[in-house]
Design a protein with these regions (language model features):
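Membrane-embedded alpha-helical bundles of multi-pass transporters/translocases
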Residues: 1-275
Length: 275
């Protein structure tokens, strides 16, 4: 989103006062932007017209169900992605970038930044879900005001945390300010009855959290196997990396499918449903 890019720009300016920090943040940013783009942008494009249509038809219950469904299915992708980025940042960064001037130290520092950014991936995506609800209700002023508040908070936090933690403080400031933005958006939506979720949303989210935790344990174990082998051949390195990626997806979606609403048939039916 625009607010996230502004926060990153501010962070980049502040990071320029530490040698190499801009590069560390840049490479970490490139990685987490991929799931953010795939999930967040698609959600925004699909959600806004659907919500706008239902607001005009005054289908309040249907609006809430659509938003709930969007949150659940975006979290079905965002939470495991966040876990994977947190558990395996060094493997991802090393495989994609560690060559030439980008050495092991650069990999370590970029990996630490990616680990911090991964804690904000869910918040970045929730902002993309909640903001269109304001636009669908023809209220673009409040998200703008919240964005300004978030930018100010991010700037102050970036300066303070940079002095304490270096470039990692900038990543932390971006994450904290994004979660703060989520809180502002959510409570205003809830307070003004733009959106009110039911208790039914908690069970699937809990299942996603549990299965994602199991995925995290699996990735942690296989990561240590990968690091102990220390391939010097790029072909074998790439083969093992792809194996980790595919096996992680298989493990997650196999486990999650045991929860009936997330098995293939019900998942397909719910995604295609307009309710």
């Amino acid at each position: 989103s625009g607010i996230l890019q502004i926060n990153i720009l501010i962070g980049t300016i502040i990071a320029s006062y530490e040698t190499g920090a801009v590069s560390f943040l840049y490479y970490a940013d490139r990685i987490y932007q991929l799931p953010l783009a795939l999930i967040g942008i698609a959600i925004g494009i699909v959600l806004l017209p659907s919500i706008s249509k239902k607001i005009k038809e005054n289908k309040k219950l249907s609006i809430n169900k659509t938003i709930e469904k969007t949150i659940v299915y975006s979290m079905l992708l965002a939470i495991p992605a966040s876990v994977a980025l947190y558990v395996m940042p060094e493997i991802i960064i090393s495989f994609l970038f560690e060559r030439g001037a980008f050495d092991a130290i650069s990999t370590h520092n970029s990996s630490m930044a990616l680990k911090v950014f991964s804690l904000g991936l869910i918040a970045f995506i929730l902002v993309k879900i909640l903001t269109p609800i304001f636009f669908a209700n023809e209220n673009s002023k409040l998200p703008l005001n919240f964005s300004i508040i978030t930018v100010i908070l991010n700037t102050l936090l970036s300066i303070f945390l940079f002095l304490e933690l270096g470039f990692l403080g900038i990543a932390a400031a971006t994450v904290i300010s994004s979660w703060f933005n989520v809180v502002l958006l959510y409570f205003y939506l809830f307070k003004n009855k733009y959106f009110s979720h039911s208790n039914e949303i908690f069970a699937p989210l809990f299942v996603i959290l549990v299965v994602s935790s199991l995925l995290g344990f699996y990735l942690f174990v296989i990561k240590n196997v990968y690091l102990s082998l220390s391939f010097s051949n790029f072909f074998y390195d790439a083969l093992f990396f792809i194996t980790i990626l595919i096996s992680g997806l298989v493990v997650f979606f196999t486990m999650i499918s045991f929860y009936k609403p997330f098995n293939y048939v019900n998942l397909k039916k719910q995604i295609l449903s307009d309710e």
